[in-house]
């Protein structure tokens, strides 16, 4: 009986020790990276100018291809996951849900060619790549296919979310703004 209680107590404390290890890993790993990316993004906004960024966002927002294909690709390549989502703040309210849908998927689909984007989820691509390597199949076509299918899927995710947002606007009797107000 005492052994079971002791084992339970050790397990319980071990749970918090493991949580502490994860926390320390985040403090020394992802958090400094995110803070650095935030500083760089805000510095770029200051250097380029808030008005110019807003105008660029308006131009990107006017076209679904730039909104859900180009902007998520550039944002994900430059700012990685999860900072690419912050670019959505420059888009009008109407397109924010759709941008998030496209950008969140781009963090996964670009990993094959650009592993710096989302190293925490690289294991998905590497698992598939390991199977192909075992079969002696080259990985180049896989990485390119992963990217191209991802880009097309990103676009459709954004576009479909646009359509569902419009349905909910009508259903709720609201109209989301199509201009940027920061």
Swiss-Prot record:
Keyword terms: Cell inner membrane, Cell membrane, Membrane, Phosphotransferase system, Sugar transport, Transmembrane, Transmembrane helix, Transport
Q: Which residues form a coiled coil?
A: none
Membrane-traversing stretches: 29-49, 68-88, 132-152
Q: Which InterPro entries match?
A: PTS_IID_sorb
Membrane-related topology note: Multi-pass membrane protein
Pfam families the record matches: EII-GUT (PF03608)
Listed GO biological process terms: phosphoenolpyruvate-dependent sugar phosphotransferase system
Subcellular location field? Cell inner membrane
What induces or represses this gene?
Answer: Activated by sorbitol and repressed by glucose.
Asked if the keyword Transport belongs to this entry, the reply reads yes
| Residues annotated as domain PTS EIIC type-5 | 1-182
- Highest rank taxon of the organism: Bacteria
Query: What does this chain do?
Result: The phosphoenolpyruvate-dependent sugar phosphotransferase system (PTS), a major carbohydrate active transport system, catalyzes the phosphorylation of incoming sugar substrates concomitant with their translocation across the cell membrane. The enzyme II complex composed of SrlA, SrlB and SrlE is involved in glucitol/sorbitol transport.
Q: What is known of its domains?
A: The EIIC domain forms the PTS system translocation channel and contains the specific substrate-binding site.
Concerning NCBIfam families, the annotation shows: EII-GUT
Return the protein name: PTS system glucitol/sorbitol-specific EIIC component
Q: What gene is it encoded by?
A: srlA
């Amino acid at each position: 009986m005492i052994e079971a209680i002791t084992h339970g107590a050790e397990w319980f404390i071990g749970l918090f020790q493991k949580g502490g290890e994860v926390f320390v890993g985040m403090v020394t790993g992802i958090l400094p990276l995110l803070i650095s990316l935030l500083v760089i993004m805000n510095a770029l906004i200051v250097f380029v100018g808030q008005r110019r960024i807003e105008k660029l966002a308006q131009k990107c927002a006017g076209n679904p291809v730039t909104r859900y294909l180009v902007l998520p690709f550039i944002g994900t390549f430059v700012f990685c996951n999860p900072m690419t989502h912050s670019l959505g703040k420059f888009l009008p309210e109407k397109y924010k849900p759709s941008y998030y849908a496209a950008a969140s998927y781009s963090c996964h689909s670009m990993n094959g060619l650009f592993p710096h984007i989302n190293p925490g989820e690289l294991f998905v691509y590497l698992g598939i790549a390991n199977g192909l390597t075992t079969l002696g199949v080259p990985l180049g076509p896989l990485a390119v296919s992963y990217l191209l299918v991802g880009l097309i899927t990103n676009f459709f995710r954004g576009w479909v979310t646009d359509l569902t947002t419009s349905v909910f606007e009508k259903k709720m009797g609201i109209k989301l703004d199509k201009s940027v107000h920061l």
